[in-house]
């Protein structure tokens, strides 16, 4: 049974929706369409945006998210899988210039040790801010240990990385930047290189009022940009806000299975973010020839956390194949089908994992798995996707080397 909103709620939602779409339209109209590079030979001057990204409102010079979910109660009040669910707190309150500076840094290969990779190489908009690989390819040309997680809605997450080892977006930035097998840079070299670029010196001064570029300012700018990667306007969201024609009957059936006590998907992938932001041990298999990945237990040393990984958000999940921390499953049907095969069925005999209590054997039919997949495809929404800069301050090609999409 679907509960319709009261007249008072309808009026409030209508008013808020008008304001929401005005915010989006105004931000796009005021945003510069072409942003060119600065002091590098052959480029024009780059300027930072003075307006918040679409979906954000500027208050006292800082950007704050405005979304219909903010009108709803907490996740706990709405129940698991409920439609009228609220949002947890998020990182926000950055200035438009800090956000835009972060965008240039994110897509500039200048941040890597040899100028070949940017953050956007492994977190590309075309792949749902992942990279389409089972495991990402780093600066050495070799695959790294895990797949590249999507960055959509990371502003809502308390812990980052598959194994939850970073407690903030700023801390998370250091991992790929300075990992020898990812972007291969060092903090000293990064700061030195940026301070040797007159365009970056000017942009950091405009964004932070600082005459010198420091590492913490780099991390803050990257965090500011990533905090605006919001995806909450899919067809599912339209359905959740009361427009029931947004989903087909097949997709609604898939959603009902998804949140049912039998499948229990929504126990961990809780709307509206479709993650409970916790660690789960589910015992997914590693690719052939690879050792067992200890996950969270690898850095905590806690035996009960071995094989534990962050519950990924399912927003834009149709764009981010392959799936799981190692990219073990090529498609959504295989990923969903994994859960139907029995508790701990893929755990190596040498491991005694504390499998999450939600994991059991729902014994779903192929048709029911297909219905869940059809629902998951309704979570696609790139309406607030930021533009890749036409030019970046280094003069290098934006984004950098992109590996071919494959799982070999």
Identify what each model region corresponds to.
Residues 15-19:
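Positively charged n-region of N-terminal signal peptides that target proteins for export
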Residues 24-32:
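Bacterial N-terminal signal peptides
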Residues 39-175, 237-351, 387-408:
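Short glycine/threonine-rich turn/loop motifs
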Residues 187-232, 318, 328-408:
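C-terminal capping alpha-helices of c-type cytochrome domains
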Residues 35-37:
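Boundary at the C-terminal end of the N-terminal hydrophobic targeting segment
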């Amino acid at each position: 049974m679907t509960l319709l909103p009261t007249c008072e709620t309808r009026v409030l939602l209508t008013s808020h929706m008008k304001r929401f779409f005005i915010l989006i339209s105004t931000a796009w109209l005021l945003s510069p369409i072409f942003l060119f590079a600065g002091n590098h030979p052959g480029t024009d001057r780059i300027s930072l945006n003075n307006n918040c990204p679409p979906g954000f409102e500027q208050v006292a010079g800082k950007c704050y998210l405005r979304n219909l979910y903010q009108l709803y109660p907490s996740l706990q009040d709405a129940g698991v899988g409920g439609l009228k669910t609220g949002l947890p707190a998020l990182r926000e309150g950055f200035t438009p210039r800090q956000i835009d500076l972060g965008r240039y840094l994110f897509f500039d290969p200048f941040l890597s040790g040899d100028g070949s990779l940017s953050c956007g190489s492994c977190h590309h908009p075309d792949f749902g801010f992942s990279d389409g690989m089972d495991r990402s390819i780093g600066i050495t040309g070799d695959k790294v240990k895990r797949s590249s997680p999507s960055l959509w809605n990371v502003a809502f997450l308390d812990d980052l990385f598959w194994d939850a080892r970073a407690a903030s977006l700023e801390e998370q930035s250091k991992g790929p930047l300075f990992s020898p097998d990812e972007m291969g840079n060092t903090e000293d070299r990064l700061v030195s290189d940026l301070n040797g670029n007159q365009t970056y010196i000017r942009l950091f001064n405009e964004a932070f009022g600082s005459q010198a570029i420091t590492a913490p300012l780099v991390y803050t700018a990257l965090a500011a940009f990533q905090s605006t990667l919001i995806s909450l306007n899919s067809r599912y969201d339209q359905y959740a806000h009361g427009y029931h024609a947004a989903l087909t009957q097949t997709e609604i059936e898939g959603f009902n299975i998804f949140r049912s006590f039998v499948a229990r998907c929504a126990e961990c992938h809780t709307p509206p973010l479709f993650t409970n932001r916790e660690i789960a041990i589910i015992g997914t298999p590693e690719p052939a020839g690879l050792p067992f990945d200890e996950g969270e237990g690898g850095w905590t040393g806690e035996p009960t956390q071995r094989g534990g990984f962050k519950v990924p958000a399912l927003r834009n999940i149709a764009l981010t194949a392959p799936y799981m921390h190692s990219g073990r499953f090529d498609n959504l049907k295989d990923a969903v089908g994994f859960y139907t095969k029995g508790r701990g069925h893929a755990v190596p005999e040498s491991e005694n994992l504390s499998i999450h209590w939600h994991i059991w054997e729902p014994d779903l039919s192929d048709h029911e798995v297909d219905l869940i997949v059809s629902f998951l495809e309704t979570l696609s929404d790139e309406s607030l996707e930021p533009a890749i800069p036409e030019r970046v301050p280094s003069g290098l090609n934006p984004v950098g080397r992109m590996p071919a999409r494959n799982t070999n």
